[in-house]
Amino acid sequence: MVSENEKTRRPKRSIQHRQNKDENNIEIKAVAKFLRASPRKVRSVANTIRGKSVSEAFQVLEMSPKKAARLIEKVLRSAVANAENNANLSSDSLYISRCFVDDGPRYKRIWPRGRGRADIIQRRMCHVTVAVKSIEAKS
């Protein structure tokens, strides 16, 4: 028996197209979920590339020594591939319209301490979303 709530629910998708009235104003995004990195550390890298062109963002990410830069670079490559294959856009004409990091679940570990006590260590996860648009739509 299917409940009323399950009938109306839409399936989750990692690739979405948002179109306004203008055909050039299309936004393509890619999402990576459950990444084993602290959202706070990943956000600092995401803030550096927001609003930049794709080629400039790749240069910034390749020069960064942080683990978060590798994770965001992978999501950005996926978003660019989505734009090229699904929307027939050139990678030269893309910029990062949105880039944000959400908190994911945490898993907890016990760290033994002195005198029979224990501390709980929280290992954090995050969800990274990168959306790209055509530069022609920006102006």
UniProtKB/Swiss-Prot annotation:
GO terms for molecular function: rRNA binding; structural constituent of ribosome. One of its GO terms (cellular component) is cytosolic large ribosomal subunit. It comes from the Bacteria. Keywords: Ribonucleoprotein, Ribosomal protein, RNA-binding, rRNA-binding. GO terms for biological process: translation. Residues 1-22 are annotated as: Disordered. Pfam families: Ribosomal_L22. SUPFAM superfamilies: Ribosomal protein L22. Residues 9-18 have a biased composition (Basic residues). InterPro entries: Ribosomal_uL22 (IPR001063), Ribosomal_uL22_bac/chlpt-type (IPR005727), Ribosomal_uL22_bac/org-type (IPR047867), Ribosomal_uL22_CS (IPR018260), Ribosomal_uL22_sf (IPR036394). Part of the 50S ribosomal subunit. NCBIfam families: rplV_bact (TIGR01044). This protein binds specifically to 23S rRNA; its binding is stimulated by other ribosomal proteins, e.g. L4, L17, and L20. It is important during the early stages of 50S assembly. It makes multiple contacts with different domains of the 23S rRNA in the assembled 50S subunit and ribosome. The globular domain of the protein is located near the polypeptide exit tunnel on the outside of the subunit, while an extended beta-hairpin is found that lines the wall of the exit tunnel in the center of the 70S ribosome. Belongs to the universal ribosomal protein uL22 family. This is Large ribosomal subunit protein uL22.
